[in-house]
A protein has these predicted regions:
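C-terminal-of-GTPase-core extension/linker across diverse P-loop GTPases
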Residues: 4-14, 19-201
Length: 201
């Protein structure tokens, strides 16, 4: 049931009972959100019960560290600390949803994406593949928006490369970070796919 709801959703709100800690069910749902490439907000509820005698700043820092460590696969998702019982932080959820909708329309064009990718390669060229002298070459990139995302466009960045098997997870993450630095879009995943293409030049 949760899988179907996630697939239908424009934005997924992952609610965590921080008093109980991050559970296996939370991780499972977060994994589905990541697999589906869905925009997401992490809502940390019952924040008032989390180390109530500590300062809010220290509590926020500890919660964020825990959330980012255990739910690293949805690191793009902003998190909001709330207390439903005290009605604290609830209004922020709607503000963040509005921001995600707005920022989703401020993503790089194909031309901007290619300039960014080329600059990223110049700054940090791909290393040789393990056990091989071959190196990844990214010829160009395109941006495609999946038609199933009607309200909030989620771009799919397609990289045309010499050999897609040379695109490592670490280099993909490097490119994601560069895109996020240039075009911050909290809550929106950065999704890559690679296609091998032979060039004669």
């Amino acid at each position: 049931r949760s899988e179907k709801a996630i697939r239908r959703a424009d934005i997924c709100l992952l609610v965590i009972d921080i008093a109980a800690g991050i559970t296996q069910q939370d991780r499972r749902i977060a994994g589905i959100i990541a697999e589906e490439g869905k925009p997401c907000i992490i809502i940390v509820n019952k924040f008032d019960l989390f180390h109530p005698n500590a300062s809010r700043k220290d509590r926020m820092a500890e919660v964020e560290e825990q959330v980012r460590r255990e739910l690293f696969f949805i690191s793009y998702a902003p998190f909001i600390a709330t207390s439903a019982k005290k009605a604290e932080g609830v209004e922020i959820i709607f503000k963040v949803i509005t921001r995600i909708r707005r920022e989703s329309h401020n993503l790089p064009t194909t031309g901007q994406l290619n300039r960014l990718i080329q600059l990223a390669q110049q700054m940090n060229p791909p290393g040789a593949a393990s056990g091989s002298a071959r190196r990844l070459k990214i010829y160009y990139a395109t941006t495609a928006v999946d038609p199933k995302y009607n309200t909030i466009p989620v771009p799919r960045y397609v990289l045309f490369v010499n050999d897609k098997s040379l695109l490592t997870d670490s280099y993909s993450q490097y490119l994601r970070n560069k895109i996020r630095e240039a075009y911050p879009a909290p809550g929106i995943p950065v999704i890559f796919s690679a296609r091998s293409r032979v060039r004669n030049d």
